[in-house]
């Protein structure tokens, strides 16, 4: 969640060889850049370097919450997230949205919903950049990529990346991190390619057909693993909670991402967040004497939460 406190007009970016510099072109010309990086480049060109300050850090609750404030010239925005990085990311994103809304900053983005691949040389096709252009064109938040899994032997590595756009999600796999990101972006573009601009279908409506694992589907699932969870006490010793959660995820069609928190807890324990790509997204906190124990505790808490949800009628 992001908040803007002051929406003063930002000075237009200037090139040395021409007039107004297009922030939109700067974003789309450099696909894969995070909002933090884009805002920093904007600040460099306008001589207003973004300044980030941590306003709140609450790690004692079930789900840690961080609030960061970013100031760029006369613009101040805040962002919240379950990690410092995510909070800064959202604060920068909010500032970019204000700059985008400024009439003095032009945005040269394609009018069609999808770029025309036939007009682009094959060696210049970039699904990551095309998806970013699509998000900017429709005023959506920029796509977020998360490396969720890395495995395979050294000579044949396989990476799995989760791409999120608003509440939409796709998973891509590849022999490199970049290839996995491209694959996830390509899946998004393929999904949107059948939507004509005339239909004016909002992203929210599109998401409704691809929600994946919802609370409703979880409660009514005939799956063996989820029904076993309903009958489990989740207190038996030597239970592999990470494996059990993974089996339920495979059965119910959602992904799990473990995010290690850099800061230790108040009593000196490691901390971790388990993020489940359910709809809505589930985030559970865990702690322990090691990173592995923290992940196991987060998985245990996630299982307890899923058990409560699945048993409700």
Curated annotation (Swiss-Prot):
Any one GO molecular-function label of the UniProt entry: protein homodimerization activity
Domain of life: Eukaryota
Residues modified as Phosphoserine: 18, 167, 246, 287
Subcellular location: Cytoplasm, Perinuclear region; Cytoplasm
One GO term describing the cellular component: cytoplasm
Gene3D superfamilies on file: 3.30.160.20
Domain DRBM positions: 34-101, 126-194, 240-308
Positions of the UniProt region annotated as Sufficient for self-association and interaction with TARBP2: 1-103, 102-195, 195-313
Family under the similarity heading: Belongs to the PRKRA family.
Comment, domains: Self-association may occur via interactions between DRBM domains as follows: DRBM 1/DRBM 1, DRBM 1/DRBM 2, DRBM 2/DRBM 2 or DRBM 3/DRBM3.
Subunit field text: Homodimer. Interacts with DICER1, AGO2 and TARBP2. Also able to interact with dsRNA. Interacts with EIF2AK2/PKR through its DRBM domains. Interacts with DUS2L (via DRBM domain). Interacts with UBC9. Forms a complex with UBC9 and p53/TP53.
Protein name, per record: Interferon-inducible double-stranded RNA-dependent protein kinase activator A
Native organism: Mus musculus (Mouse)
Lineage, uppermost ranks: Eukaryota, Metazoa, Chordata, Craniata, Vertebrata
């Amino acid at each position: 969640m992001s908040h803007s406190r002051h929406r003063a007009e930002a000075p237009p970016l200037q090139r040395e060889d021409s007039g107004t510099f297009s922030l939109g072109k700067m974003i789309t010309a450099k696909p894969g850049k995070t909002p933090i990086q884009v805002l920093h480049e904007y600040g460099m060109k306008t001589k207003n370097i973004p300044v980030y300050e941590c306003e709140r850090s609450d790690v004692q609750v079930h789900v840690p919450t961080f609030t960061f404030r970013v100031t760029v010239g006369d613009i101040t925005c805040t962002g919240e997230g379950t990690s410092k990085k995510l909070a800064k990311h959202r604060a920068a994103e909010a500032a970019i949205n204000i700059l985008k809304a400024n009439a003095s900053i032009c945005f040269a983005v394609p009018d069609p919903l999808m770029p025309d691949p036939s007009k682009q040389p094959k060696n210049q096709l970039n699904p990551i950049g095309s998806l970013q252009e699509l998000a900017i064109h429709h005023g959506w938040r920029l796509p977020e990529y998360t490396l969720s899994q890395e495995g395979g032997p050294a000579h044949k590595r396989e990476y799995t990346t989760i791409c999120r756009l608003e509440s939409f999600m796709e998973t891509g796999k590849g022999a490199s991190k970049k290839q996995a990101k491209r694959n996830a972006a390509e899946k998004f573009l393929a999904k949107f390619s059948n939507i004509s601009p005339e239909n004016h279908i909002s992203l929210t409506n599109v998401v409704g057909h691809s929600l994946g694992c919802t609370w409703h589907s979880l409660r009514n699932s005939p799956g063996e693993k989820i029904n076993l969870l309903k009958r489990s006490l989740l207190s038996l010793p030597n239970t592999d909670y990470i494996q059990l959660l993974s089996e339920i995820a495979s059965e119910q069609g959602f992904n799990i991402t473990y995010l290690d928190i850099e800061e230790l807890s108040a009593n000196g324990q490691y901390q971790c967040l388990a993020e489940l790509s359910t709809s809505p997204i589930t985030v559970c906190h865990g702690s322990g004497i090691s990173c592995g124990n923290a992940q196991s505790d987060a998985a245990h808490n996630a299982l307890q939460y899923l058990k409560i949800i699945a048993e409700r009628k």
